[in-house]
A protein has these predicted regions:
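Non-catalytic scaffold segments within catalytic domains of secreted glycoside hydrolases
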Residues: 1-200
Length: 200
């Protein structure tokens, strides 16, 4: 497909041989939201190639959506599906969740409570749901060895600048002040105890 659209880099036979002979130590997987697709119903109108040349986005009308991030779909089951795909179709290589995060806007996170902590319980609940699915996948043989939740502090994004927040700590863009979120305390306990109790 890439060759058909003139998107492959120029390589020598030696380059190709080196790439083909190399082993992967482990794979890093970034996951935020599922992406559903359907066959194109309209003409592709860009003058350069993107994968959307072959499909359009599709929305599941019965889906569950994040009210704090552009109504992106929430589908914890997708973590299990990713793990099963790597296990069943890619030799069950070692991998880890290099990025997973739950976006909220500044207003949705609210202000710190009396204890000085920003209460982002919504984020914790969703992370728990996703990690339950990852635990289930590991129990079913997936070779996942770790999770890196995005991210330490609210940061700039290529897509949303500072519109969406992911951090364990809030960053005040005017003053540089940092305020801890409840999610940070939860994740610290999770990392220390290597688990949590869930009824999910």
């Amino acid at each position: 497909i890439l060759a058909a659209h003139d998107c492959l880099p120029t390589t020598s036979k030696d380059d190709a041989a080196l790439i083909l002979s190399a082993d992967i130590d482990f794979l890093g997987v970034n996951y935020y939201v599922p992406r559903r697709v359907k066959a194109r119903e309209s003409e592709y109108d860009l003058d350069y190639f993107t994968p959307e040349y072959y499909f359009e986005n599709a929305v599941n009308p019965q889906g569950r959506f994040n009210p704090y991030r552009d109504n992106n779909e929430i589908l914890p089951q997708a973590i299990y599906d990713i793990a099963a795909n790597i296990r069943d179709n890619y030799g069950n290589i070692k991998w880890y969740l290099a990025e997973i995060g739950i976006a909220m806007d500044r207003q949705s996170e609210g202000e710190p409570g009396a204890d000085g902590v920003i209460d982002d319980t919504f984020r914790i609940q969703l992370m728990e749901e996703h990690l339950v699915q990852l635990h289930r996948a590991i129990a079913d043989g997936a070779n996942c060895f770790g999770v890196h939740q995005w991210t330490f502090i609210d940061n700039w994004s290529w897509i949303n600048a500072f519109k969406r927040r992911y951090g364990f700590w809030r960053l005040d863009l005017e003053t540089g002040e940092r305020q801890i979120k409840r999610n940070a305390l939860w994740f610290a306990e999770l990392a220390t105890s290597n688990g949590f109790t869930s009824d999910k």
